[in-house]
């Protein structure tokens, strides 16, 4: 089903019949782009759908930036940012879920048509797949960055989560392309995915993972076989078919190496990869809230939402004596905010949050030097109660202090730091809205707080 047919289908649905309002909205989008749909529309828009337990945001952003670098008209919908000339949403603003209803899908279609986009890069989460929102989207390329059955265990069982992710690759048109990142799951599930459809398939992984999990390296399209991670970024070597490429980026954290290889594999599959253009693209790429790094006065400030993976990467730098102390600013999501989905109010969810909090503090006890406990979408729970619970799990094994105001916590962590230290601001990534009671919220973005503090300090 082509994109125009999908638009017509959605417009005909009962809940989306207010066509006059949509027409006005569409005309506004076209006016914002300075064109009319008839003059600007492309007959065929290439759609790239990217799902996975992690990494999908980074892969989507790299692909989008590369396409723009080539002069292509690309629209990006990711949880870190939406980049669409026809939208009213500010670039670099976080988006909780890229699309959550048929109405959202229709708006995206109208935007890409108004802009005359050649490419749509769309981050896809499991909720959208489960709701059937992806069923009729004519994806040209479908990507699985990785898979961890426990990634969303407060919402799905391992079996349910696996079935949902696998379903994204079933019933595809033969002309479509499939790209699978092989990292956190077993060889048997990879074999299931390879049999899920009749499309052409590409796999990317690392030499280490392929060896440990017993996968034939000849069957892997893109193989990461060398990686050096330093405070200056990542350097790596990748085998792609019969060629070897050297890649270099200022992007940090070991886990991003496979994200970079994943984006490369998608572009290679599409026949668009050029090593020189790609290296230029990734050299200084920054993705909001994902390994966002500030290097000032010998300190390194990291904003990221992936606690375990970032701590692992920082520990490696510490073992090599590239960094000194690791300071972490962290909070924990509460429950009960009025507009959250019902599942965030259940007894099971509350129990799962306590389990997650304990796990996070266990990691901190092993790997960090100072912890600043603060607010992070506490909802109905009191910030102090959450922080006291977290402090209890730390068992005085690591220095910690409670600073309820998040901005003040970030400020103190930076001011307390010494040359060679790392300040890791965890949990919220690029999000701005912080739900601080059952009925209220405030606006705070970690990167803006960091930049404000650095400016005040003259750093």
What are these regions (language model features)?
Residues 2-26, 268-275, 280, 284-287, ...:
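ATP-dependent carboxylate-amine ligase
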Residues 32-84:
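Walker A (P-loop) phosphate-binding motif
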Residues 45, 172-177, 196-200, 368, ...:
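A short helix->loop->beta-strand "cap" motif at the edges of active sites that frequently abuts
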Residues 139-146, 161-167, 201-205, 435-457:
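A short, gly/pro- and small-residue-rich
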Residues 155-162, 166, 191, 195-311:
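Adenine nucleotide phosphate-binding catalytic loops in nucleotide-utilizing enzymes
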């Amino acid at each position: 089903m082509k994109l125009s047919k999908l638009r017509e289908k959605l417009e005909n649905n009962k809940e989306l019949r207010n066509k006059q309002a949509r027409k006005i909205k569409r005309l506004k989008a076209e006016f914002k782009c300075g064109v009319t749909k008839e003059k600007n529309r492309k007959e065929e828009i290439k759609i790239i759908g990217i799902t996975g337990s992690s990494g999908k945001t980074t892969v989507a952003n790299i692909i989008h930036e590369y396409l723009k670098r080539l002069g292509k008209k690309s629209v990006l919908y990711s949880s870190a940012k939406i980049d669409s000339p026809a939208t009213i949403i500010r670039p670099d603003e976080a988006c909780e879920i890229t699309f959550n209803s048929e109405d959202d899908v229709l708006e995206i279609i109208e935007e890409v048509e108004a802009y005359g986009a050649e490419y749509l890069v769309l981050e896809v989460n499991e909720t959208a797949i489960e709701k059937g929102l992806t069923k009729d989207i004519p994806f040209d390329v479908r990507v699985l960055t990785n898979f961890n059955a426990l990634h969303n265990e407060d919402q799905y069982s391992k079996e349910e989560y696996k079935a949902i992710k696998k379903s994204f690759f079933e019933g595809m048109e033969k002309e479509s392309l499939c790209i699978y990142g092989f990292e956190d799951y077993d060889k048997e599930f990879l074999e299931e995915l390879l049999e899920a459809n009749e499309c052409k398939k590409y796999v990317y992984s690392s030499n280490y993972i392929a060896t440990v999990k017993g996968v034939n390296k000849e069957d892997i399209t893109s193989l990461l076989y060398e990686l050096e991670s330093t405070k200056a970024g990542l350097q790596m070597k990748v085998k792609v078919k019969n060629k070897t490429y050297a890649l270099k980026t200022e992007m940090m954290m070991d886990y991003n190496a496979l994200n970079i290889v994943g984006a490369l594999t998608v572009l290679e599959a599409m026949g668009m990869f050029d090593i020189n253009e790609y290296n230029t693209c990734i050299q200084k790429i920054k993705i909001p809230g994902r390994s966002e790094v500030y290097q000032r006065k010998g300190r390194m400030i990291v904003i990221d939402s992936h606690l375990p993976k970032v701590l692992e990467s920082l520990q490696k730098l510490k073992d090599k004596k590239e960094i000194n102390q690791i300071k972490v600013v962290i909070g924990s999501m509460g429950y009960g905010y009025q507009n959250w989905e019902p599942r965030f109010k259940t007894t099971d969810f509350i129990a799962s949050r306590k389990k997650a909090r304990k796990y996070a503090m266990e990691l901190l006890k092993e790997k960090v030097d100072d912890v600043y406990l603060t607010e992070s979408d506490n909802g109905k729970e009191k910030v102090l109660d959450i922080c006291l619970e977290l402090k209890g799990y730390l068992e005085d094994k690591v220095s910690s202090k409670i600073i309820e105001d998040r901005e003040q916590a970030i400020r103190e962590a930076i001011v307390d730091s010494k040359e060679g230290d790392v300040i890791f601001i965890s949990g919220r990534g690029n999000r701005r809205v912080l739900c601080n009671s059952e009925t209220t919220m405030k606006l705070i973005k970690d990167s803006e707080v960091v930049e404000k503090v650095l400016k005040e300090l003259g750093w």
